[in-house]
């Protein structure tokens, strides 16, 4: 049985004063993630009415591809940035699978 690709919808809301830096940190994830095995889609979006809100639409071929993604140096740098700077007012992640 073939594994159905996994879609992740990840929302971030920057804490006041962290909007630009958080946006830059999120943008830095895009290019290297596109090169990862199993990455199908990795798109960063922003709310045009609220510059503190960002959303990733991600599609990976498998859970193994997601596991690899979160172990990469660029993702680990982002996690370190989050821990060191506390730039988030809110964050959520929803995981989806296609209906066959």
Language-model segments: which ranges?
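Glycine-rich beta-strand-turn "strand-cap" elements at beta-sheet edges
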Residues: 1-5, 44-50, 80-100
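Active-site-flanking beta-strand signature of metal-NTP-handling nucleotidyl enzymes
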Residues: 6-12
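Hydrophobic packing within well-folded, soluble alpha/beta domains
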Residues: 10, 22, 42, 54-56, ...
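Short, surface-exposed ligand-recognition loops at beta-strand->loop->(often short) alpha-helix junctions
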Residues: 13-19
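Short, charged/polar surface micro-motifs in flexible loops or helix N-caps
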Residues: 16, 50-51, 61-64
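Short, glycine- and small/hydrophobic-rich beta-strand elements in well-ordered beta-sheets
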Residues: 31-55
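An amphipathic, aromatic/His-enriched active-site/gating alpha helix that lines ligand/cofactor pockets
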Residues: 32-40, 59-93
């Amino acid at each position: 049985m073939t594994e159905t690709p996994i879609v992740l919808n990840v929302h971030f809301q920057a804490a006041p004063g962290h909007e630009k830096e958080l946006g830059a940190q999120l943008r830095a994830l895009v290019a290297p993630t596109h090169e990862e095995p199993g990455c199908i889609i990795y798109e960063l979006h922003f709310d045009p009415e609220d510059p503190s809100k960002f959303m990733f639409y991600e599609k990976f071929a498998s859970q193994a591809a997601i596991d690899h993604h979160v172990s990469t140096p660029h993702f680990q740098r982002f996690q370190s940035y989050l821990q060191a700077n506390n730039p988030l007012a809110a964050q959520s992640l929803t995981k989806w699978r296609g209906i066959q």
